Swiss-Prot record:
Gene: matK
PANTHER family: MATURASE K
Keywords of this entry: Chloroplast, mRNA processing, Plastid, RNA-binding, tRNA processing
Species: Platanus occidentalis (Sycamore)
Annotated signal sequence range: none
Disulphide bridges, residue numbers: none
Function: Usually encoded in the trnK tRNA gene intron. Probably assists in splicing its own and other chloroplast group II introns.
Descriptive protein name: Maturase K
The UniProt record lists the keyword Isomerase: no
Chief site of localization: plastid
Any single Gene Ontology cellular-component annotation: chloroplast
Keyword check for Signal: no
Amino acid sequence: MEELQGYLEIDRSRQQDFLYPLLFQEYIYALAHDHSLNRSILYEPMENLGYDNKSSSLIVKRFITRMYQQNHLIISANDSNQNKFVGHNKNLDSQTISEGFAIIVEIPFSLRLVSSLEGLEGKGKEIVKSRNLRSIHSIFSFLEDKLSHLNYVSDILIPHPIHPEILVQVLRSWVQDAPSLHLLRLFLHEYRNWTSLITPKKSISIFSKENQRFFLFLYNFHICECESIFVFLRKQSSHLRSTSFRALLERTHFYGKMEHFVVVFRNNFQTILWLVKDPFMHYVRYQGKSFLASKGTPLLMNKWKYYLVNFWQYYFYLWSQPSRIHINQLSNHSLDFLGYLSSVRLNPSVVSSQMLENLYLMDIAIKKFDTIIPIIPLIGSLAKAKFCNVSGHPVSKPVRADSSDSDIIDRFGRICKNLSHYHSGSSKKKSLYRIKYILRLSCARTLARKHKSTVRAFLKRLGSELLEEFFTEEEQVLSLIFPRTSSPSRRLYRKQIWYLDIIRINDLANHE
């Protein structure tokens, strides 16, 4: 945001809606270049990100001029197969325009966010900024604190628009620049299979690297609109207000939307505000999959279910079937979420109480939030990546002839450490040890295959210590902080550990 403010000297009161001329500015594509290099630096090598040096604003200017001269903005269903828009430089043109357009179309949202932050600071309200809120594992900490007090949960698959024009019309309330909206229509017609990009069952990673930022913006904006009802109802309900609410919504640009829905939907939703009078109502989402948990009754959950279906259909023209929302009782249901199976289990315990000469034994059941690794889907992901077969038997992976042993070991070790780091919150470590065993033996088979030997002969010749270095147990890492001699540390090794530096789901763990 500081970069945008430095480059863009825009009068917010009059010029923030005129975005189309910015397509012809050199610094827009410089920003797009910087964002493309920084977006996945923690997970992908720099050489895999890449950037086409032939892309420049000069090509964009010539391309847009040619597009208007040949009247390519008018696209009908009859000539969709003979679209001259792409020409012979389809990848270059679409990548360059979409990267710049993705930067530009975010400007109104960023400016509204800054205005909201400045307004809150002027009123003396403190905005809590913490990078820990970005961590996926922070969701499990929230669930561990809240779900043990709730009874029912609804699994919700957020619907996707059936026509691209719906998304354009919704975006029109934020961006009032007609040429920019026409250009958006052009992109959506160009990517005719765009609806598959925001299907809830698909991962964000399916977006092509060339247009990832553009489609990520469309996806996040679509989700933001679908969730707007929760923002309004939570603000209106006196029982659901909290000081941390604004901090949690900081990165999703809900500040302007909160004020907007208070004005627009006040009259329409006043009669249904009683639905959220229960203070034990919580909503969690990642990508297109979300959960709505409550301490209420099945009748209340069913009313929420049909209300959401009608709301999405009436206000956003999103076709959603009631069968896409499943209501389950937490005591006998596991949430398949973010690579974990989460559930609330009763942990029985016996408490003895002595009063004078009488001894009383009381059976007490305490609710406990439990997370385990779904071993079968994870083995399926490993089999798909050619680390093992479908039954979990490790196999060797084909490698390049010029790959060194250290490169192969580093690759397997990095995958093993990432999985161990991500699944450190599992309450049962046996499944995690099995995954480590598969990766370890697959690495040994790969090295033996390269040297045209057997695994036993290879390890006997070089020593089993060759593979010990990178398969570091979680306990060994924790021992650097907590000494093993203390009894609390031994219990710590068996407990769930949540890290606050994980900002996306592991690719192998994303088996949905």
